[in-house]
Amino acid sequence: MDFSRRSFHRSLSSSSQGPALSTSGSLYRKGTMQRLGLHSVYGGWRHGTRISVSKTTMSYGNHLSNGGDLFGGNEKLAMQNLNDRLASYLEKVRSLEQSNSKLEAQIKQWYETNAPSTIRDYSSYYAQIKELQDQIKDAQIENARCVLQIDNAKLAAEDFRLKFETERGMRITVEADLQGLSKVYDDLTLQKTDLEIQIEELNKDLALLKKEHQEEVEVLRRQLGNNVNVEVDAAPGLNLGEIMNEMRQKYEILAQKNLQEAKEQFERQTQTLEKQVTVNIEELRGTEVQVTELRRSYQTLEIELQSQLSMKESLERTLEETKARYASQLAAIQEMLSSLEAQLMQIRSDTERQNQEYNILLDIKTRLEQEIATYRRLLEGEDIKTTEYQLNTLEAKDIKKTRKIKTVVEEVVDGKVVSSEVKEIEENI
């Protein structure tokens, strides 16, 4: 029965080096010594996996040909050593699986705590912020309304003061006009008194003339009574009574006419003055009404202008505050995005590294399982036959090595990461 000698060697590195399997073997006939390469595997962090080889010599020969025991004394010790190492391999595999589970749990926990979806939800505060902003806006509007009411009250007080001044000026003007009219009335009264005095004097003169005329008539009568009646053809004498009556009537008519003319003139002057006073008062009132309306319009426009200016200032302040608030929020969001991007890049790089390490560990596990199966077949007495063609094929396999260079560029401002950039370069060795 032929046996073959095989030696397994693995070398794993952090630069994603493919597993290299080198086999060298030679065929021994019966009665020769066969060396079995026994492997001890232990892992190093980020330094790949190294394989140590322990060689044990087993003698075959006539024991096999004579049907003796396959494993002698030394062979039993070697198999016990193999079993111990196999148990250590299995323990190593279990520990690696546990480490892998722990790493997966840590990755999952890290994603749960640091993933962007787990950012604190501030939406519950938005309603309070909106309510407070509305209250501030309402308070500003109420403040502007109070200021406007104060201005309106001041303008109304000023309007009443101006109206009071206007009414007082009108009162003074009317009193002055009344004083002027009273002077005119006094003058007319004096003229009336003068005319009445003149009428009385004229009446006295008339009475005196009547008395004198009566006396002259009496004198003439006495003279005629003492004289002899002589009839003489002569012109008729003058009738003095008729003449006096005519004169009296003329003077009475003249006095009545003068009195009537004085009364009419007084009434005309009074009416003219009253009309002028009325017209002037109406014009003055119309002018005052126009002035009052213009002042009121001016005050209304001034109030509206002040309210618009105050509203404009309030809106400008609100706009500036809103811009500043949104600018700060935008800066905070950008900073958060930059930090999250940097964390995401770091997570990706860590995930790739852990995935690579996981693949390495999985490959080690697979190869260990293959070796365990090989040892199991050896323990069960199976032969491992490797032909010259298989050996040449394994030796002829190309070993591909790649080098991966990862560059992380971070921009830090005031101790905070603003931007982060990761570059990866893969080279064939």
Curated annotation (Swiss-Prot):
Residues 244-382 are annotated as: Coil 2. The keyword Coiled coil applies. Keywords: Apoptosis, Coiled coil, Intermediate filament, Keratin, Phosphoprotein. Residues 75-110 are annotated as: Coil 1A. GO terms for biological process: apoptotic process; cellular response to starvation; epithelial cell differentiation; intermediate filament organization; regulation of protein secretion. Residues 221-243 are annotated as: Linker 12. Residues 1-26 are annotated as: Disordered. Residues 1-74 are annotated as: Head. Signal peptide: none annotated. Residues 383-429 are annotated as: Tail. Residues 75-386 form the IF rod domain. Expressed predominantly in the intestinal epithelium in differentiated villus cells. It holds the Pfam family Filament. Residues 10-26 have a biased composition (Low complexity). GO terms for cellular component: cytoplasm; cytoskeleton; intermediate filament. The modification Phosphoserine is found at S13, S16, S26. Gene3D superfamilies: 1.20.5.170, Single helix bin (1.20.5.500), Vasodilator-stimulated phosphoprotein (1.20.5.1160). Heterotetramer of two type I and two type II keratins. Associates with KRT8. There are two types of cytoskeletal and microfibrillar keratin: I (acidic; 40-55 kDa) and II (neutral to basic; 56-70 kDa). This is Keratin, type I cytoskeletal 20. The lineage of its organism: Eukaryota, Metazoa, Chordata, Craniata, Vertebrata.
